Amino acid sequence: MRKLTLIRHAKSSWADPMLNDFDRPLNKRGETDLPLMARRVREFGLFPDRIITSGALRALTTAEALADTLELNPDQLCELPDLFESCSETLLHVLQQQPDHFHHLMLVGHSPGLDALAYYLTHEALKKFPTSAVLHIHLSITRWSELADSCGTVVLFDYPKMHPAPL
């Protein structure tokens, strides 16, 4: 069995209309949600063998915070700039190419690619895949190359608005 954790980047800023979409940083809510989400990932015991992330600033910032909170080694973080704006087929192909000595992968990316990949793997329709969402899937495969339609089961789905701020 393999495990896959899909994480959508923390909320990003649209404050600078001149900034390229790839280079948008986190906004105030993203900066608040990210450490809380990273701590929950740790509390859930989701320690991946590798984090694969889009190279977009908001995704990379999210992945680096996760790696730091999970106390991963720098070589466990794999930045792939081409994952920015990738469709689910591209994400699937990247995952299918991963070495089989990795049993748990974490993929930090963007909507709608993550949404479509999650549905393809589990056939569970999520109402939405909000920013800072964590979707953990158990996969009925022994090798990453076997990743296919409906091979996964959702074990956990968590996002910031499920945890209202204390009054």
Label the predicted regions.
Residues 11, 56, 112, 141, ...:
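Short, glycine/serine-rich, charged loops/turns that create anion-binding
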Residues 125-155, 159:
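Domain-level recognition of soluble alpha/beta enzyme cores
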Residues 98-106, 111-133, 141:
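Non-DNA-binding regulatory cores of transcription-related proteins
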Residues 96-106, 150-158:
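A polyampholytic, Gly/Pro-enriched intrinsically disordered region
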Residues 83-99:
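Short phosphate-binding loop-to-helix
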Residues 19-22, 65-68, 92-95, 120-124, ...:
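Short, glycine/charged-enriched secondary-structure capping and boundary segments
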Residues 2-3, 7-83, 167:
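Active-site-proximal alpha-helix that buttresses catalytic centers in soluble enzyme cores
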Residues 16, 62-63, 89, 116-119:
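Short glycine-/acidic-enriched loop or helix-start segments at secondary-structure transitions
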